Each structure stands twice: as C-alpha cells, then as structure tokens.
C-alpha cells in the first residue's frame, strides 16, 4: 500500500515515520509513505501557498494553484484510489471506514492548514473528506497520522499477531472486553477465575459479556446504532 501526503510542514512527520508501527510497516515492505512539501509548488520567490480570504475575515486560505500543481503532478505518475482531505467537516473516521480503506492500494492525503483551503480544491480534486472528530486542530497532519495508523495496522503482515487488529474495539460494533495479565492477584485485586480456567468457550462467553457491558456503560450509542441497523 502507498500513501502520498501533502503538507506545508513536512518535517512534522519525521519522528513518527522513523519509529512505531508506521516505521515497522515500511521496513517490512508492506507500506510506502511519501511526504510532499506544498511549498515546493508555492508561488513566487517566497513560495507562497496562502492568501487572505475574499470577503474579508480572520485567517488565511490555502491558494488553489500550489495544490492543483502538486496533486496533478502526483496523479501524472500514478492512479490514486482516493484523494482525501483531512477536515473537521468530513466523514467521521470510524473502524468500518478504516477497514474499507485498508483494502485500497494508493491513497493521496491533503493536510489542511491555516483557516481553510480554497473551495475549488474541494470541488475539483478531492474525492473523500475525513474528520477525526468534532474538534478543530491547527492542521491536518495529526489526523493524517491517525488515519494512516488506523489503516496500516489492518494490513496483513504488519502486526506481529495478525488477529490482534480483528479483535479490537469497534470491529464488531462493540468496545473490546477487559483484559488482564500477570500477576493473577495484585494487591488483593484478582483476575476473574474464568480467564484462568483454560476453557476457551467459557472465556469467549465472558469476553462477549464484558464487551457488551463496557459498551452499555461507556458507549451506549453504539448499541443504539446496532439496534437501528438491525431493525
């Protein structure tokens, strides 16, 4: 799988791409990640990429010329399954969306910055808009990393335990169950006996009940959504 990421602060990605899961995936040859500096396509001597908004108001807006030039140059080299803009008013990033995107080959991510991007970019170039929540950040770099991490961990061969990602929270519409490890008794707090029994069927029943209970308490909206989809 390949990611091409467009950003006005490309150095933001340096430490993350040389450590952790994304670095492991790259070393295994499962993922390619390329960061492109939008300023390389900027205008004039100072490589300008932003300007004041028509109509006045606070903040700056990313100009269309650099973005069109960058994306068109990349599209001339390969086909992208999706050109994604990270924005607060996009489709909410949830597990089913990450699952779908993990089956694609080439994704192009545009990180917003400043107040906004020129609307003509969204109308003509962007095929998908994704939000990580109802909150405004200083740029799309953190959402881009979140999106890549959510996708990459689903690619077969990336995680040491291939089933780990398939049993995470949200994969079946529920939060994950509670987990315990050694010691079995810590300061009088004991691990549930069923988890020590070795009886796998009983363990799975306990985990299902635990997942349902945690979801009911912490995210009842997930149960309501599942009920609506069922009926």
Swiss-Prot record:
S-adenosyl-L-methionine binds at residue 112. One of its GO terms (biological process) is tRNA N1-guanine methylation. One of its GO terms (molecular function) is tRNA (guanine(37)-N1)-methyltransferase activity. It holds the Pfam family tRNA_m1G_MT. Belongs to the RNA methyltransferase TrmD family. GO terms for cellular component: cytosol. It is found in: Cytoplasm. The gene is trmD. It catalyses: guanosine(37) in tRNA + S-adenosyl-L-methionine = N(1)-methylguanosine(37) in tRNA + S-adenosyl-L-homocysteine + H(+). This is tRNA (guanine-N(1)-)-methyltransferase. Its EC number is 2.1.1.228. Gene3D superfamilies: 3.40.1280.10, tRNA(m1g37)methyltransferase, domain 2. The keyword S-adenosyl-L-methionine applies. Specifically methylates guanosine-37 in various tRNAs. SUPFAM superfamilies: alpha/beta knot (SSF75217). Keywords: Cytoplasm, Methyltransferase, S-adenosyl-L-methionine, Transferase, tRNA processing. PANTHER family: TRNA (GUANINE-N(1)-)-METHYLTRANSFERASE. Homodimer. Its main location: cytoplasm. It comes from Chlorobium chlorochromatii (strain CaD3).
